[in-house]
Amino acid sequence: MLSIDKHLPAPHGLAAVLVRRAPKLVLPFLARSRSRLRATLDDGREVAVVLPRGTVMRGGDVLVAEDGTLVEVQAAPEQVLRVTSDSRLALMRAAYHLGNRHTPVQVVADALQLEADPVLEDMLVRLGVTVTHVQAPFEPEAGAYGGGHRHGHDATFEEDYAAAQALYREHHGHSHDRGCDHSHSHSHDHDHDHGHVHGPGCGHAPHHRHD
């Protein structure tokens, strides 16, 4: 069994012919995100990988065994969700909700890709984007998986969705500016109150009452 303890992220500067001739370690993203594992190379040899904790192997990276053997990492095709939309705004909103859940996401041309998950798929459909199942290598953005891998299996989507809708209405419907056409009241429990916050163009005389 080969023991591997060195990881060379791409671009590693090794001669292309050496990498091309090297045996391949073909793994899905979940396995490539483990720093310790046993696996089988494409030539049938067994390997034990022991890398620094937190290491994520990417397609094109090279591993070096204790005996000097080079091994090229390849991202295995796996079941992923591909998210597309004719509306750039809808796709941006989908990316926001996925990021809010710390979901690993791969950004490709005009699409997002993520690990297959029925709950997240339902959320995305409700957001109005198109979701298709494809077999493809999965290479999420670096750091997207930091802080844990959390799916939307909770009630936070309803709150996030409402907040996103409210934000959209605020920017595309009614908005407040410095001219303050109407008043806002703010009550306080301390000894004085401010009935209105005055700004340029307000048109109201200042009033500040002390008891």
From Swiss-Prot:
Major localization class: cytoplasm
Protein name, per record: Urease accessory protein UreE
Subcellular location: Cytoplasm
Chain residue ranges for the region called Disordered: 170-211
Keywords carried by this UniProt record: Chaperone, Cytoplasm, Nickel, Nickel insertion
Gene Ontology molecular functions: nickel cation binding; unfolded protein binding
Higher taxonomy: Bacteria, Pseudomonadati, Pseudomonadota, Betaproteobacteria, Burkholderiales
Domain of life: Bacteria
InterPro entries: UreE, UreE_C_dom, UreE_N, UreE_N_sf
Similarity section: Belongs to the UreE family.
Annotated organism of origin: Ralstonia nicotianae (strain ATCC BAA-1114 / GMI1000) (Ralstonia solanacearum)
Compositionally biased tracts (Basic and acidic residues): 176-196
Gene3D superfamilies the UniProt entry points to: Urease metallochaperone UreE, N-terminal domain, UreE, C-terminal domain
Function, in words: Involved in urease metallocenter assembly. Binds nickel. Probably functions as a nickel donor during metallocenter assembly.
GO terms of biological process kind: protein folding; protein-containing complex assembly; urea metabolic process
Keyword set includes Cytoplasm: yes
Keyword Phosphoprotein on entry: no
A cellular component annotation (GO) from this entry: cytoplasm
Gene this chain is encoded by: ureE
Pfam families (UniProt xref): UreE_C, UreE_N
Record's signal peptide: none
